[in-house]
Amino acid sequence: MMQLLQLLLGLLGPGGYLFLLGDCQEVTTLTVKYQVSEEVPSGTVIGKLSQELGREERRRQAGAAFQVLQLPQALPIQVDSEEGLLSTGRRLDREQLCRQWDPCLVSFDVLATGDLALIHVEIQVLDINDHQPRFPKGEQELEISESASLRTRIPLDRALDPDTGPNTLHTYTLSPSEHFALDVIVGPDETKHAELIVVKELDREIHSFFDLVLTAYDNGNPPKSGTSLVKVNVLDSNDNSPAFAESSLALEIQEDAAPGTLLIKLTATDPDQGPNGEVEFFLSKHMPPEVLDTFSIDAKTGQVILRRPLDYEKNPAYEVDVQARDLGPNPIPAHCKVLIKVLDVNDNIPSIHVTWASQPSLVSEALPKDSFIALVMADDLDSGHNGLVHCWLSQELGHFRLKRTNGNTYMLLTNATLDREQWPKYTLTLLAQDQGLQPLSAKKQLSIQISDINDNAPVFEKSRYEVSTRENNLPSLHLITIKAHDADLGINGKVSYRIQDSPVAHLVAIDSNTGEVTAQRSLNYEEMAGFEFQVIAEDSGQPMLASSVSVWVSLLDANDNAPEVVQPVLSDGKASLSVLVNASTGHLLVPIETPNGLGPAGTDTPPLATHSSRPFLLTTIVARDADSGANGEPLYSIRSGNEAHLFILNPHTGQLFVNVTNASSLIGSEWELEIVVEDQGSPPLQTRALLRVMFVTSVDHLRDSARKPGALSMSMLTVICLAVLLGIFGLILALFMSICRTEKKDNRAYNCREAESTYRQQPKRPQKHIQKADIHLVPVLRGQAGEPCEVGQSHKDVDKEAMMEAGWDPCLQAPFHLTPTLYRTLRNQGNQGAPAESREVLQDTVNLLFNHPRQRNASRENLNLPEPQPATGQPRSRPLKVAGSPTGRLAGDQGSEEAPQRPPASSATLRRQRHLNGKVSPEKESGPRQILRSLVRLSVAAFAERNPVEELTVDSPPVQQISQLLSLLHQGQFQPKPNHRGNKYLAKPGGSRSAIPDTDGPSARAGGQTDPEQEEGPLDPEEDLSVKQLLEEELSSLLDPSTGLALDRLSAPDPAWMARLSLPLTTNYRDNVISPDAAATEEPRTFQTFGKAEAPELSPTGTRLASTFVSEMSSLLEMLLEQRSSMPVEAASEALRRLSVCGRTLSLDLATSAASGMKVQGDPGGKTGTEGKSRGSSSSSRCL
């Protein structure tokens, strides 16, 4: 912007240069804008005008000055005359400068005499949050009847905030109240006021008044607020209150309305009779005093009357709050808002102010057109069109004009070059008129004196010069002479010439004194047909005046370019053309052009089209000529080679025809034609070309094309590419199918090492090696009829036989978990209020169920199988722990030593033996069967205790719940199923292929290998029994001693039941693998020892799985018994007595058979023994 301003200050254009010789100057207008916050300290710098104009150093040297043409008196701004420094002279208050306008803009003009610029300065005064919202009164008093309906609205005083923008009034809040709420209403003029709303019925007897705090907030940073106390007095109820026809009204009034003018008549009705129905009107006392002084209302008629004249410039709008109330006691006033908008009236005459750029009325004739003379400001206090002023000049010659800059400000400019010799003085009339309906105008006389100066610039004889010359001229050729005249005298009239810089300025030159223009070099029409340049004429005056003119030079073409053949393509001035002839018919076919002059080109066979018409078009010769007009129009002719007149050449189009119908006789012949292309210039230029035409048959052409190597056609390339792509796709598809088939085949068998390799390739899991020790063999857990406890063991040692002879039965070593709560419940029920006979029977039953000589039992966290220990003598009894601890240790003599434990010699898997009779003798009943019967007894006892009045049935919910856990005891096989993330052992149906090798005693193969034919043997169909059938047989066998318990008929394992086990899990997945009858070993197990190392001896009794199921049953019974711990024990004693009799009948009374190994001593109430104490057969045994 500054550079453009400087350029404009240096040049005027076609009229000449700007200059400053007198008091008046030509000025370029410039608008600058500044911002300043209000309340800044005095002397704050706002801006610097010299920086806006640039070239400060030059201005200092030239003594530049800044002159304020107009400065509003209300704006305390100081302008430095040397550098144009703008600063505040005193305190700035935006509310005083622009009370009702936002943004607040204050403008004035400054003339920079040394820079030839008129600067229009606009200063925006920014508002700061220096005022807080204020209410007209700090306390408002309202009256409302207690019978006021809900949603009744009461207007409140409006807060005033003189700030603008975000600093002005933003919202209202009301102190918490359950009877009143606040609603903020935004008016048409964006004003905000609050209304009090009744949200809960009022009761004067409860609350006769309310004190509420109304707070008004602005949106400044930080926000400011103002408060007002609102006192609401609750009056006795009045049946009805007046009602306005409309709650809010808006009207307009001219500002020139006379006092006493009726503005509006309000009406309100009250349905009451008498004084309660008479309505009177009054203005709200909460309105500003200015409103109360300007308007009044008749109390009886409701007429709103103007009291004093209005002035739109002071207040353009008023808001009047009118209330109406009846004359009854405790009236409820009704409210109506009346918005009065004042319409501006053209009642102000424009005023004219003239500020001269220099000393008054003296203007130099040196000023060019559009030079600044003075600043004219027209002002009108009206608004809108009434305040828009239009100014114009009344003059005879029209040498001056007015130009609007902004608003009502004009510049007086020169409209022509002034000439003192002709008009030494001008008298102008300045008129100003507003744009109102009834416009008002003003006028002012201006007298201007003209001073003499060098005011004439050189003037050319023509406004534009044109000249023509032929190309290929000689250097220094005279083109034209330019003439300019200057009306000034002396050196001011001496003119010099020069050519303005341009891209073509180097082609010509001009004599600075005579104006003769010459060519500097030879010109070429083909490069440019013409060019234009500017010639500037300057006088010698001070300042120098100049003018310019445009000169156009057009070139005439000369025939200096010969035609050039572009088709067919020539090689060394030669081209060949092969014409195909059908040997049988003699018809001509489509010819083939050869640009190399050696014969047919290309290997593609062209599409053949027979032409039997006469003459036949062979080709079209095309030539180009760079010249224009007749110099560029070629003519074609055959100079030689066409003596037989076989060929015809069109001289204008260049089409070559063969004049023959049957071309059979021409096969094998060659013709050389000399073609001449000549333009029509003077003198003409020509080009020669040799065209060889050969007539060949189509068969010979195809044979020749096949012999010669060439590029494949596009169609052939496409076919080859498609074939290659299809072949590649077929190979990829075959390879993919082969890989998929191989993977499918490999997935049919499990390979430990492949699983380990696959597991190692898992990217998201830490690699874990699968070793032989991670795969455990799970034997079949089933008690078979007629099968002793030593089935599946290949070796018997002498120590075990000695223990059997001493009365130790390994079948009884199965660990049985009894929770403390269940033990205490059974014992306490036998001692609380039961007769001696019942206690004796209960004690016998307890002995029968729990007092078995047992190995130290493993907890749920450590499920290790017990090892048998030989009985070295008669064990001595050892007292049990007290009643609070159900578990105790049975120990022998102090000198007895614990028998050493050693693992069995074989690791053969147990295999269930089938029996034909399907019966089990009570004398040879195995350990799991006795455990099962003990569980049934506990189940029946718990059921009888919980439901003593109900009858025992198979379909009872508790029995069904217990039967589900009992069925788990019969669940059979488990097999390892390796997973890439660890081994997950799932139950496998009995009819499926077993992953555990079966062995038949000593015939088991070494390393756990078995015969494949034995792996897929089906089980007995009798095994497919439901849980309900199994439970019915067990209960019937228990209550009927003559019937045995068919334990060999097992149900198929169900993985759903396996999922119900709440086995304790550890972080090491290897500890969670169930391996019944497998003794703990410290020997390392790897893949190298897989199937070779000897496994510990397996035992069909006392398995860890059975112990876990018994623990589950114990927990179930504990929950059942705890729910009815206060139940009388008569029913339980009777049930236990029956169970004891059935047990003795079935030879299950283990208390007698184990008398040699353990004795229970009870001395309730001071008898022979102490309750809860017992003696075991080994120091490592545990009594549950």
From Swiss-Prot:
Topology feature Extracellular, residues: 25-718
Biased composition (Low complexity): 1175-1184
PROSITE patterns noted in UniProt: CADHERIN_1 (PS00232), CADHERIN_2 (PS50268)
The UniProt record lists the keyword Transport: no
One family name in Pfam for this protein: Cadherin
Transmembrane segments: 719-739
Single GO MF descriptor: calcium ion binding
Tissue localization of expression: Expressed in highly vascularized tissues including the heart and placenta, but most tissues contain a low level of expression. Prominent expression in the spleen. Present in villous and extravillous trophoblast (at protein level).
Chain residue ranges for the region called Disordered: 854-928, 973-1023, 1153-1184
SMART domains on file: CA
Gene3D superfamilies (alphabetical): Cadherins
Keyword annotations: Calcium, Cell adhesion, Cell junction, Cell membrane, Disease variant, Epilepsy, Glycoprotein, Intellectual disability, Membrane, Phosphoprotein, Primary microcephaly, Repeat, Secreted, Signal, Transmembrane, Transmembrane helix
Listed GO biological process terms: calcium-dependent cell-cell adhesion via plasma membrane cell adhesion molecules; cell adhesion; glycogen metabolic process; homophilic cell adhesion via plasma membrane adhesion molecules; labyrinthine layer development; neuron recognition
Signal peptide positions (record): 1-24
Any single Gene Ontology cellular-component annotation: cell-cell junction
Residues bearing attached sugar chains per UniProt: N415, N582, N659, N662
Acidic residues: compositionally biased ranges: 1012-1023
Cytoplasmic side: 740-1184
Residues found modified as Phosphoserine: S859, S1062
Domain (Cadherin): residue spans on this chain: 28-135, 136-244, 245-352, 355-460, 461-565, 600-711
Known function: Cellular adhesion molecule that may play an important role in cell-cell interactions at interendothelial junctions. Acts as a regulator of cell migration, probably via increasing cell-cell adhesion. Promotes homotypic calcium-dependent aggregation and adhesion and clusters at intercellular junctions. Unable to bind to catenins, weakly associates with the cytoskeleton.
Disease connection: Diencephalic-mesencephalic junction dysplasia syndrome 1: An autosomal recessive syndrome characterized by severe global developmental delay with profound intellectual disability, spasticity or dystonia, and congenital microcephaly. Brain imaging shows hypothalamic midbrain dysplasia, diencephalic-mesencephalic dysplasia, and intracerebral calcifications.
Name of protein: Protocadherin-12
